[in-house]
Amino acid sequence: MWADIYHKLVEIYDIKAVKFLLDVLKILIIAFIGIKFADFLIYRFYKLYSKSKIQLPQRKIDTLTSLTKNAVRYIIYFLAGASILKLFNIDMTSLLAVAGIGSLAIGFGAQNLVKDMISGFFIIFEDQFSVGDYVTINGISGTVEEIGLRVTKIRGFSDGLHIIPNGEIKMVTNLTKDSMMAVVNIAFPIDEDVDKIIEGLQEICEEVKKSRDDLIEGPTVLGITDMQDSKLVIMVYAKTQPMQKWAVERDIRYRVKKMFDQKNISFPYPRTTVILSEKKTN
């Protein structure tokens, strides 16, 4: 008899456990589908909005899309979590009432969360940077991949993805907003003909100006900017469109190398002068 009762209880609890797991799985599936569906609607909304009469830069649209998706996901996560807690017969209302909103916030570190979210709001509101911008944040440089309510993600050229809490962002340098300055310093031996080199650099500047459409001003030969024991340095500078300074600098350096080869001008190298003295002996 006792064995029958035991097996009956096990059967009942097994049924309840399976039902509980199925309910949790159902909530998770609904949350997953809800997130995917919301992402699709948000994408469609901003795509249609970008084609409306009110034009916004594509970077701004990408930023708003990312931010809206993050906000909706947080809401769905919260609702799914509350539904799962309800399966444990835990009422969120009574939980907040018993614990107190203030103590619960402190206990879960919500102060930092609120700080991050407020900072994220002002980043968007003040248009400090957008998705796709190349920025330097707290000494870390990279391209902004995502701006969320809590964190900002930037990817460096070679050092991976950096995830920075919005509340920790103290200083931002945005290299995409305005024009940039391309600067190339050309060094050559001090005994070379300066006029010949300046003339060649001016020809290069004219060639670059005619061949590129990403220049705002220049390039211009500034003149000799440094004198050392064995070399002189001439600076060439140009104002470029955002994110084009490096391409312009590479182009100028390439043309300078070809010009030096054609004119038989050597690049400076360390020199050591040795003076030998001969002693006369009787």
Curated annotation (Swiss-Prot):
Keyword Cell inner membrane listed: yes
GO function terms (MF aspect): identical protein binding; mechanosensitive monoatomic ion channel activity
Cellular location(s): Cell inner membrane
Transmembrane region(s): 24-46, 67-87, 90-110
Major site of localization recorded for this protein: membrane
Transport as UniProt keyword: yes
Periplasmic side: 1-23, 88-89
Cysteine disulfide partners in this protein: none
Keywords: Cell inner membrane, Cell membrane, Ion channel, Ion transport, Membrane, Transmembrane, Transmembrane helix, Transport
Membrane protein topology class: Multi-pass membrane protein
Domain notes: The C-terminal cytoplasmic domain is important for channel ion selectivity.
Function as written in the Swiss-Prot or TrEMBL entry: Mechanosensitive ion channel that participates in the regulation of osmotic pressure changes within the cell, opening in response to stretch forces in the membrane lipid bilayer, without the need for other proteins. Has high selectivity for anions, and may contribute to resistance to hypoosmotic shock.
Family (UniProt): Belongs to the MscS (TC 1.A.23) family.
Family annotation (NCBIfam families): MscSThanab (NF047601)
Protein name: Small-conductance mechanosensitive channel
The gene coding this protein: mscS
